[in-house]
Amino acid sequence: MMSDGFDFQVEDILEDFRDMLETKGLSDLVFDYSGFGSQGDGACFTGDIDLKNFLDAHPEVRNNHRELYIAVIPFDGEEPACDYYDIKLTKIVGRSSYSHENTVHLGSWDYTLANKGGGNEREYTYYENLFMNAEKDIEDVCKAYMRQLYRILEGAYYKEYEG
């Protein structure tokens, strides 16, 4: 995280934002920002996405990707059809020194099929397509959170320095 020597309570803001994002299915968050008033300023974060919790917290995404949601929820105590794990929101490294929503992307979708004979290529392709179809919507939600975080940080900065 970059602070550029700002005196306002960045840590408190980030901790509150982290707590909010954790209720939305995001965890292991690392924040970065630059500001305020230059081209390329912004805020971003990287971390892990618990797909089921993320979809539960974002009904607009869940409703657009019902098949994916059904694949990741257990029914009647059974394992979900697709056991998902390690979905990463990663920072694009080396592209720029900026810290804003366009410097991150979904990095990996790792998943396994439930123990039903180990799955086959057709099943893997099916679930991979479900994930890939949802990728843009999931990124868009995360990027909206990044813009929201930047607005909060920017507001706190100007309140502190311009009173």
Per-segment meaning from a language model:
Residues M1-G163:
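Alpha-helical propensity feature that highlights long, continuous alpha-helices across diverse contexts
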